[in-house]
A protein has these predicted regions:
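Hydrophobic anchor residue at the start of the ABC signature
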Residues: 143
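Conserved ABC transporter NBD signature motif
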Residues: 61-76
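Catalytic Walker B motif of ABC-type/P-loop ATPase nucleotide-binding domains
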Residues: 154-158
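Helix-to-loop junction immediately C-terminal to a conserved catalytic motif
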Residues: 53
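Conserved ABC ATPase "signature" region
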Residues: 100, 104, 110-125, 176
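Helical segment within the ABC ATPase nucleotide-binding domain
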Residues: 168-179
Length: 179
């Protein structure tokens, strides 16, 4: 049934200047299941995720989250949390300031900032400049940002890229616990 499909992608295609990077993609994701895309660099994985959350317009086809396009949600961060680029932070802004900025821009409580910093284990470094974070701490900050709206769905693009085995294990266990 439709309620058992959290993400539905139908005939999704994306072409840039005549080069097709995603071609007639169809899939469904059910709630509570950790699902991944596998493929070589340039296969269209990131582009697909960007189309799902409305950052790239498909050439054709549709992507729906819980039956609706991402753009139709009045408070989208409460439906979908995304980590598409962990380096998307102002390097001179503290972790807490970055999250407060995102929360304020989306009408969310500042109280939630402290909660998500605790969830991802960054409370002790919340006042530190994000530009000084290690790769693993940057990934955790990206996850904290994705969790701000307490979303039903998380879309994470390469959340373990470049992490050491301990960091990979932490992200894997963290995501499994959320599912």
């Amino acid at each position: 049934t439709a309620l058992e499909r959290m993400i539905t992608v139908s005939s999704l295609t994306k072409a840039y200047k005549g080069t097709t990077v995603v071609n007639d993609l169809n899939f469904e994701v059910t709630p509570g299941i950790v699902t991944g895309f596998l493929g070589p660099n340039g296969a269209g994985k990131s582009t697909t995720m960007r189309m799902i959350v409305g950052l790239d317009e498909p050439t054709q086809g549709t992507a729906r989250i819980d039956g609706k396009p991402y753009a139709d949600y009045k408070r989208p961060l409460e439906k979908v949390g995304t980590l598409l680029d962990a380096k998307w932070v102002h390097p001179n802004r503290s972790a807490a300031a970055h999250l407060r900025w995102v929360a304020a821009a989306n009408g969310m409580s500042k109280k939630r900032v402290d909660e998500v910093l605790g969830i991802v284990g960054l409370s002790d470094v919340a006042g530190r400049k994000a530009g000084k974070f290690s790769l693993g701490m940057g990934q955790r900050l990206g996850l904290a940002c994705a969790l701000l709206g307490d979303p039903e769905v998380l879309i994470l693009d390469e959340p373990v890229n470049g992490l050491d085995p301990e960091g990979i294990r932490w992200v894997r266990d963290f995501v499994r616990a959320l599912a």
